[in-house]
Regions:
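N-terminal alpha/beta PP-like core and its mobile active-site loop of ThDP/TPP-dependent enzymes
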Residues: 1-214
Length: 214
């Protein structure tokens, strides 16, 4: 429903208490209609916020059976709209599944925001075995050779800037996929005081350069 008001980070809302809520709101302010994902525990906090905080709209979850499918849908969306779509892939294993699709998007020069997750990076609070094998110190290195940019923010507030900057870079010609990796800990961090994170307009993509004159 286009008449429904879409909240943004600049709205005065008091009930956001987890880092994943702030991160989900950063996706909403980009006006992503969908986020394509294969569910995984590494971004359980963000998944919860997409459903229970945002109400599963703007973005709406598109559940995929494989990470390469999720990236392929985002590639097709970008081919039609010339705009980035959001994708979420689980930890190191999901990123490895997605990697061939990310490479295709890179070769096709299409914009895409890929959200990953890992951790907890703090080994003292990891669950036995499963969170050890799904944690990587430099997860972005797996696709760094065929993405425009990647980041691993250390706080929810930094994650907002990473998403804003990543979308700007993805949509700026020559377009390409970007990757933002979210530690489990910052997703589940309780937010006591909400900071003013500034205007998203400061991260607008520049106009395409003029073609060379003959």
């Amino acid at each position: 429903n286009e008449s429904k008001k879409i909240s943004t980070l600049s709205d005065d809302v008091d009930d956001r208490i987890y880092g994943s809520d702030i991160i989900a709101d950063a996706l909403r302010e980009q006006r992503f209609p969908y986020i394509c994902l294969n569910p995984g525990a590494s971004y359980r906090g963000l998944h919860d916020s997409l459903v229970n905080y945002l109400g599963n709209h703007t973005p709406e979850i598109v559940t995929c059976m494989h990470e390469e499918h999720a990236v392929g849908i985002a590639q097709g969306y970008a081919k039609v709209t010339d705009k980035a779509l959001a994708v979420a892939v689980h930890s190191n294993v999901g990123l490895m599944h997605a990697s061939m699709g990310v490479f295709n998007a890179w070769c096709d020069r299409v914009p895409m925001l890929i959200l990953g997750a890992t951790g907890p990076l703090d080994a003292a609070i990891r669950r036995p075995w499963i969170e050890w094998i799904h944690t990587a110190i430099d997860q972005g290195s797996m696709i760094r050779g065929f993405t425009k940019w990647d980041d691993q923010p250390a706080s929810p507030e930094a994650a907002v800037e990473s998403i804003r900057r990543g979308v700007m870079l993805a949509n700026t010609a020559p377009s390409g996929p970007v990757y933002v990796n979210l530690d489990v800990t910052i997703q589940e961090q309780k937010i006591e005081t909400r900071q003013n994170l500034g205007d998203v307009a400061h991260f607008s993509s520049p106009e395409d350069a003029e073609p060379p004159k003959k």
